[in-house]
């Protein structure tokens, strides 16, 4: 795998949340391929250790697995304890929560949990690690958002609103932290081939575009933070659609495809 990331700038350790599967797992793998040790955080500790063992064998880096539920109050204390002795050069705040459905029918607890994971966790993680990165005068923060985050998606009203927060938060931080030598990138993928797709869509086969691979999403995200781009929308077609397709058309298309 081609080396894309400056490990002297973004290493020796990275923290990746939501690292047990999907984009987070692949980001952990590609960071390790660039010689960076990885703290992998998620709820499923057995799966984390399995993924970490594979990364350690393949790339000869170190890993540390942290079992944590980002929807729980006080989660940040577990992260602090797990990383206190490490020099974290890159925060990858990837974990997210989403459930499709008509807003009036969704459980209030699920809605609160989505905000806890998709908004509060990003904020608390950055608030803890950003001062340390500023003190280092190098490093980076990658926040995982979503393509079209500012549109507002029917049957994903709450999750899409939280992704709009991630976009605004990340682009503001990019401006604030750049002068301190800290890169900030919002990685905003479109529909990606992960286990989440069947959970959200009535018929994944009816999606009228090819799903992105996690490998492409991770690689473009890593290249973007190396270049300190404020926003990365992976895939040329997705970038084109993000620029030119009206939000009203996106809403209608997604409303037909998502589970109610």
What are these regions (language model features)?
Residues 13, 20-22:
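Conserved glycine-rich cofactor-binding loop
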Residues 34-51:
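Conserved glycine-rich Rossmann-like NAD(P)H-binding loop of the short-chain dehydrogenase/reductase
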Residues 94-99:
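Conserved NAD(P)H cofactor-binding loop of Rossmann-fold oxidoreductase domains
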Residues 102-103, 107-115:
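Substrate-binding pocket helix/loop in short-chain dehydrogenase/reductase
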Residues 126, 162:
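Active-site helix of classical SDR
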Residues 146:
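Residue(s) in the substrate-gating loop at a strand-loop-helix junction
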Residues 186, 204-240:
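C-terminal helical subdomain
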């Amino acid at each position: 795998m081609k080396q894309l990331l400056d490990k002297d700038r973004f290493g020796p350790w990275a923290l990746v949340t939501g690292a047990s599967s999907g984009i987070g797992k692949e980001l952990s793998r590609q960071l390790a391929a660039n010689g960076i040790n990885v703290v992998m955080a998620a709820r499923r500790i057995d799966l984390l250790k399995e993924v970490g063992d594979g990364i350690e064998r393949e790339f000869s880096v170190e890993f540390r697995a942290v079992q944590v539920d980002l929807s729980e109050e006080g989660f940040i204390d577990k992260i602090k304890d797990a990383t206190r002795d490490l020099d974290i050069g890159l925060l990858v705040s990837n974990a997210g929560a989403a459930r499709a459905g008509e807003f009036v029918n969704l459980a209030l607890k699920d809605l609160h949990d989505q905000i806890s994971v998709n908004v509060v966790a990003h904020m608390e993680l950055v608030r803890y690690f950003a001062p340390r990165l500023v003190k280092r005068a190098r490093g980076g923060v990658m926040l995982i958002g979503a393509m079209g985050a500012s549109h507002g998606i029917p049957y994903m009203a709450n999750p899409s609103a939280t992704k709009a927060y991630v976009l605004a938060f990340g682009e503001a931080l990019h401006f604030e932290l750049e002068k301190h030598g800290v890169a900030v990138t919002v990685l905003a993928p479109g529909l990606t081939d992960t286990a989440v797709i069947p959970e959200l869509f009535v018929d994944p086969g009816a999606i009228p575009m090819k799903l992105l691979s996690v490998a492409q999403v991770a690689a473009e995200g890593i290249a973007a933070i190396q270049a300190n781009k404020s926003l990365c929308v992976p895939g040329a077609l997705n970038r084109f659609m993000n620029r030119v397709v009206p939000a009203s058309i996106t809403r209608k298309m997604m409303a037909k495809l998502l589970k109610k």
